[in-house]
Amino acid sequence: MNKILFTAVEARVVGCLLEKQVTTPDQYPMSLNGVVTACNQKSNREPVMSLTDSEVQNTLDMLVKKHQLTALNTGSRVVKYEQRFCNSTFGQMKLSAAEVAIIANLLLRGAQTPGELRIRCARIHDFADMTEVEQTLERLAQHEHGQLVVRLAREPGKRESRYMHLLSGEVDESSRADGHHPDDHRGDLEGRIAQLEQQVATLQRQIAQLLNNGEVK
């Protein structure tokens, strides 16, 4: 497993920087105000947040300490920030444009299906087809720096399984697509208990009948 662990706000900040680095390069690196606006925008964000300047500033400072961002003093009074999460001069994590697109969108919107990712990643990377999306997810799941994404159990009524990033820690085991879910085991146990209770009740009735008939002394 990778060693990076982001809080929800840290994940939002890094996701915004990854996104804006590609979609609005003329506004990158980003100022505090730019990051706040990106974090709180209503489109392509799940959940929608209402972060304050101080909350975002504290998060930026923490990410700088974690060596995931660089604070740039460009000679003006405004400090600008650039991500060091991947493909930076000092970082070791190397990701393709397709991989960056998927990681950014998972950080910004949480778990999504390959079909959703193909549509939502279009502004960062235009996937040729679903095969490219699936191959990219597979590479991220087997990345040299540790597993970066995981396939979740398919939800009832859904055609596709969703994928989630692992940059905020392990996903709840009941959500993993490994075929072993606590709810399934609990359901099996409850069914077995009900069956045993029925068998006990049947035996008790049979014993009572035998006693009443005088067949048991």
Curated annotation (Swiss-Prot):
HAMAP family: UPF0502 (MF_01584). It holds the Pfam family DUF480. Belongs to the UPF0502 family. Residues 173-188 have a biased composition (Basic and acidic residues). Residues 169-188 are annotated as: Disordered. Disulfide bonds: none annotated. This is UPF0502 protein ETA_20480.
